[in-house]
Amino acid sequence: MFVSTAFAQTATESQPAPAAGEHGAADAVHTETGVANDAGHGSGVFPPFDSTHYASQILWLAITFGLFYLFMSRVVLPRIGGVIETRRDRIAQDLEQAARLKQDADNAIAAYEQELTQARTKAASIAEAAREKGKGEADAERATAEAALERKLKEAEERIAAIKAKAMNDVGNIAEETTAEIVEQLLGTKADKASVTAAVKASNA
């Protein structure tokens, strides 16, 4: 119990003075106690290293460790486990979503390649049809041109033949007239037209 100096002084002053014998005995006891206390203070060790305190220290250590274990197992570890489990589920969901997106991308690429192949095939078909159509149109135009040219050549040949026939007819007439005039100049008489015509035709043959 802690006692202040003033309280101890007041208590001492209020007590009656001891007798001479009692005073001597008290001094002797005080002297022996002081010596014993001095001896005890001089030979004392640090309390944590005092073997007499080991049992209590081990007890408190066990209690502290038990409380720490309970705190870790009931509070900290479940929270950490919950966080890890949540994180694992989130990672699994992310991986699943990534796989789904990859599958969608693969499907889109396959569809694009299929559409591209179909477009190329259709373009080739259209080009081939246009080429065939152009070839057919060219053949038709060439045939039309050849027919027109042949018709014009035939017309030209007919015209030339007509001109030639007319020219030959004119030449025959001129020859007959010339022959008749020559005969008339030579013989002094007019020649027979039928005879002159027969003679000119015979000479042309």
Swiss-Prot record:
Superkingdom, taxonomy of origin: Bacteria
Q: Where is the protein situated, by its record's location annotation?
A: Cell inner membrane
Q: How does it sit in the membrane?
A: Single-pass membrane protein
Task: Show the segment(s) annotated as Disordered.
Answer: 1-26
Q: Name one Pfam family in it.
A: ATP-synt_B
Output compositional bias ranges, type Low complexity.
16-26
- List the CDD domains: ATP-synt_Fo_b
User: Main subcellular localization, coarse class?
Assistant: membrane
* Matching PANTHER family: ATP SYNTHASE SUBUNIT B, ATP SYNTHASE SUBUNIT B', CHLOROPLASTIC
Tell me its family.
Answer: Belongs to the ATPase B chain family.
The protein's name in its UniProt record: ATP synthase subunit b 1
Q: Which organism is it from?
A: Brucella anthropi (strain ATCC 49188 / DSM 6882 / CCUG 24695 / JCM 21032 / LMG 3331 / NBRC 15819 / NCTC 12168 / Alc 37) (Ochrobactrum anthropi)
Gene behind this protein:
atpF1
